[in-house]
Structure formats: C-alpha cells, structure tokens
C-alpha cells in the first residue's frame, strides 16, 4: 500500500503545471479587467474632453485712427495733441462658443482710452447687420486698455468734447471698424479648442497713487491684504485641440500712463508693449501686427494704480510730495509728479511692459487648470443717477445725478491739472464756484446734498446743452465662460472697490450653487463713467473720489447690481432680467473743432517725399538712424487707406538683390514725427532706434504718405507718394 499513489495526489511536475495554469488564467483575467477598465476610463475622459471643448476664435485689427492734430484721450490736456506715431493701436477679439449650442461670448480688448457708449452702440449696430442676433449687448464685452496716448473724440457726451475738440469722426470710425474687423476675423477662424487659467503675482510694476485714500478703508479690511494694490495677474490661455497656440487674455491692474502728458506720439503704452512682446515671440518671422497669435493685456481695477513706481516728487526741487494733497512747498500741486523706473517715459514704458510680459509668459507656460462648463451672459441697462441701494434691512440710500468735484480738476500725480486745484478738497473755492455759476449754472441743493462731502465743480447731471454732459444710462454685464466670470465694469474701480465687488459676486455664485468661480474684473467697458471709489475713500475727496460721478454710494449700487447678474447666471435665469432703459443716441456727427484738411505744398525745387536731412552713412546698434522728409498731413493717409504704414525699415539682401521689409510703423523701435509748417507745408522725421542684436548689413528708411492736391475750383484729391533715405550701413559691434 505504501508504494501506491492516492487518486487525489499529483506528481511534483503536475502540481507545477497546475499552479502555472492557475496563474496564467488569473493574469489573463486581470489583464482583461484592466483593459476594459482602461478603455472605459479613457472613453469617459474622452467624453468629458469632448463635452469640455469650445469653439475658439481670435482676431486682431488696426484701430489707430488719425495720428495728427487730434487731442490724445486720457489726461484731459488740450495741449496734448497728436503729432506722430510710436506704435499702432489694435483691437483684439476673442470668441468662445459652445459647439453643440447657440451660446457664445465675445471679449474685445482695444488699445484705446476707454470704450465710449457711442463706440459700443455703433459696434453692436454693425454686428447686428452682419450676424443678426448672434452677437448682442449681453454677450459682447468691449474693454479699453486705458492707454492715455490714443486719439480722442469718440464720445457723444458733451464733457468729453471740451478737451477733444468735439466728435472726431475719423477716430470714431477707426475704432468702430477696427473692433468689428477683429471680431470678424475671430468669427471666421473659430475652431475646437481648450481654455486654461492661471494666476500669479506681478512685482515692481505698480504703486497706489492715492495711498492716503486707501488708508481710509477699515483697518480690519486692509489687514486681509499684503499690499495696497492688486498685484495678481489672471491669465486665460487658448489652444486648439491639437495644442496649437491661439492666444491669451491677461487681466492686471495698472494704469497705462508710463507715457506722460508731454507725449505727442500715438501709442499703446506699457500694456501695449507687453502685447507687442508676446505676439512677436509667438509670431516668429512676422512683422509687428501680423501673425495669428493674439495676446491681449486687458485692464482691471486700476483706478488708483500707477506704473510710476518711484513715486511722486516735486519737479522743481526733487523732494517727495507723497502727502494727502500731493502738493509741493514751491509751485503747489502742479509741481507734484510721479516718476517711472526708467530714465525717461520711453524706457519706463518698456520696463513696466516687459515686467508684465515676463509674468504673463511664465503663467502662460504653466497654465494647467482647464476652464470647462457652459457659457452664459447677463446684461442690464441701468439709470445710475437714481438707484436705490439697500445697505441693510433698515437703511436704503440713493445714487446721485452725475457730478465732478473740485479735486477732479487737480488731476493726479500721473498727470497734474492746469490750474490751482488740489487733491483732497472737501470745500469749494468761492472764485471757481462763482465762475461755474455764471457759465454753467449752480448745482441744485438736492445734487449738492446727495454728493456730500464732495464740493461740486461741474454739475454734469444737470447740464444738457447742447447734449447731456454725462451718461445716466449705464451697462452692467457679466459673462461666464465655464468657471470664469468676467465682470465688465463701466469705469475705473479703485483697488479696494474692485476687491469688494469681486468678493460680493463670488459669494453670490457660491450661495446659488456655483462655487469656485474665478471672478475677474474687466475695466473701462461699454460706457465710461469715470471712477468708482469706496464710501470711505470718497470722504477724502482725492481725484478718484471727486471723479466718482454718481455719489458716495456708487460702489454699493454696482455691488447690488452685479450680485443680481451673478444670481441670474447661477440660477440660469438671465432671460428673466429686465433689460432696462436703452441708452440714447445723439445726433452729434457735425460737432467738431478739428481743422479741415487743406491743399498742401512742397518747398520750391522739392516734391513730397524728398529728403531734407539725410541719414549718416554708418551706424552701430544703440544709435538712432534719423531722416527728415518733405511731408504731408498724416490724416490724409488715415482717411484714405486701411492699416496704412507710414514707414518701413528695409534691409538689402545680396542673395536676391532686393530690399526686404524688416520693421514697420507698428514696431516700438521706430518713431514717426510730423511737424506742421506754414503755407501748407510740413515735415516728417523718421527715427529708428537700432536695438541690440540688429544684424549687420545695408538698410534704408522709407516714408509713405498722401498729400492734398487741388484738381479744379471744386475738387481736391489725395495723392499717394513715398520717399526713401539713402542706404546706410549697420556695422557689427
């Protein structure tokens, strides 16, 4: 028996084979499970990605307008009239749409001082004629970068005519057509894409220009923040489904006033320079203003934020004037001016712009948080001169008819006023009040009481000749792109005003089932209503408070209104919002003091485009190549050509025996100066500030223009011409 094997027993070899078989079966089962789990998971991810896809389109178009004889918009200085070009102005448009639905939103950032009501109404009118109800007042945001170096004259309200010589049709037309064209380009190039958001801190690029006003806010509130400015940049990155780069929008709070009020060259200032750097980086080998990648550096709550980081100094003595009234011992407020980080305004513009660009580049490269979810938009027109604000269960207050205080005329440390006004004025000046009463009429007791403690200089809400001086009907608007909520605000919110608005809207979303929204403020949108200071800042009546035109409760009114829009979006109830009273359209097309274009002439023995002062034969990098031509009024070109170049820098190619354009007038390395002479004559000077790294070789500078020529007694025509410098050599360093 001992030698017999049991029926249930197996040899060692058989046991090994059985174990191997079991292991193989188990492994096969595991692999099959993993395969199907992986496939199901991938299918799920693919489905999520498919649902998360948007249609994305980007576009850029020129909106420069006339670069000569038109006052620049921003500093309200009638002496600051355009006299040439440093950089072109662009409208940058971004469209996001749901592939399977009709919902879409448009965000436009334009290199202009602010979006006026007239610009918005004209843009919406053109969009309606092209696209029907696809692009409307609720889903189109128009935002200005707030450059103070763009042509003025695109407003329909009387106050803005005073320093811009009325309504300037060429400016209005250029801005409107440029915005519409940028939207057209974005519309035509829509493709499936993805959006990513990122945020980070920008250092060494801003200061609070009214720090004493900021200190009036509750200490408990101020203790929650490390700075008296918002240093955070929010960036939205756009790519297509293959990962190809499309563009970006950056929101950051800083005034584009690195170029001061002595400047006469049209340009887009520090944020425009940031756009230029980013677009040149992404559109390799393209001229400035060309290429498919679009980078917008949009405005935010910049009301009290200056790029002039060295702070205010007395221009005559050099001592600091960082005091509550921003005044100097000798010369008063007119001598107190802030300084940027550079040796001059051109270098300061580049330094601040590059700081902003470098942070945006870092955030762009690291952006990984995807924006997903439905699109929504909410909009209302509101009569801001008569909003009831519920502060709490027992207290209700009112906004006021628009009015500007005495400190409005004082200007800021970025651009001082022309007369003996000072910031922080809580009492009127009998001299100026008497002049106001005689010329414009005394403010009503009701308006005076409503605006307390503001001493009223211009009671614009009660001034209606020849048209109202300020808007009553104002746009409030929120656009939601998934988890991103863009608050389109109609003016310049101060740092703390912006923080309060964002927090209030964030809480509203949170409490109605939409937690975790990324809330950003887009400034200078849709209609311009000056500044929005907090109630506490308003009591000190520095410039920003004196320019809070609807009274001390303006911010509270906006918070109430934007909370209502956020609630409607969160509850999918935007259709139930009352549209409100539509804004008026005034017939102001012929109200202008801009000089008419007249017949021009060249000096004896010369013709248009001839060289008057020639370039040198040789230059090195870091030097300035300069040539002066017999010129003509640049307004002729603006009114007779689209996206016309006034100049080119060209390099000679030995291989092709031809000249190749290497720079145009959108470059920040070139400058175009126009100077008007007598008897219909004028000169044009072109400068090329040769940057480091310029390739050695043979170059020339070319000039393009139009002059007015009389054909007969009744007819004047524009004649194109061009000129060229001699060839010159750039030698290796």
Set out the residue ranges of the language-model regions.
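Non-catalytic substrate/cofactor recognition surfaces at enzyme active-site rims
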Residues: 2-733
